[in-house]
Amino acid sequence: MSQYTAYVAYNNAQDIVWIEKDQKGSLNLKKESANPEVTEGNSCYSREGAIYGVYKEQACTTKVADLTTDAQGNSNTVEVDAGTYYVKETKAPKGFVLDKQVHPVTVTAGKTAVLKVKDLPQLDPVGVLLGKIDKETNQNKPQGSASLEGAEFTVKYYKTEPTGTQDPAEQGKVAERQWIFRTNEKGQCKLNQDHLVSGDEFYLTPTGATTFPLGVVTVQETKAPEGYIINPEIFVIPITSNNDGSEFIYTYNEPKIPETLLTLDIVKVLKGKDTPISGVVFTHTDSKGNQEEVTTDEKGQVVLKGLTRGTHTIQEKSVPDGYTKNPGVLKFSVDENNKITL
């Protein structure tokens, strides 16, 4: 008798009782990704485990059932009285934004109503990709005539869940997208067209801002700036979610990449012997015409730092008493790969 409702009416002649069969229908839900290009084939996202409450009113106070999705985004089917219901997500699935919209749906007797919904994937709106610093000073200011501008980095994005700080390429995985970026005068690269040299299309938020999906990003320097040696280290940055359903996550940790100065050591010794001579002053003229004076230490050594690309000269300016100045000029060059040739 649970499928029937009894009604009682009264008049002057008699009491009237009748029974009507309740009108039932069914309801289920189909969940899809609002951005399948980002989520399909990416184990950081799953449509399984989303929970939607089914309510009698738009205020969503009287719940009559729950709908829970499987890995294909299909929910269980519930039987309810015919009428209008309001469906709202109470738990977002892995990697997706909680859908706060209230969805009205009408259930017709004897039929199954299917509500189709879409969830946005969580994204990380990265601003600064990386920053370069001088290894000696730990600052984003170059030494001498060196520059932090013009370094190039290859950035790769992998559709995969992080495994600690392991490079996905070591696991045989292929990057989904990759780009080459160039640093500005502050040694920074930003995820935008101004710093892009070449590469694939950017991932974008619904408002058009550049972003990364959940997964793994690797950063590697592929061209050093003037005056520095290339840093071969591959920096692995996991982009993860705590699955709280928030629209954006901020787990991209901008790497600070240290740069080692390109240097040339010069040692002044007594002719025919290995005796070092201290106090010898040299004039170094770099490829841009800038000059500096450097003096040998007690080991007869002087170090030229931050060598720019092009031709350089070294010439003795003065020597200690008892020594004769060498009139010769030493020339050396630095090529585009920061290789020194004497």
Region annotations inferred by a language model:
Residues 1-342:
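Solvent-exposed loop/turn and edge beta-strand elements of beta-rich ligand-binding domains
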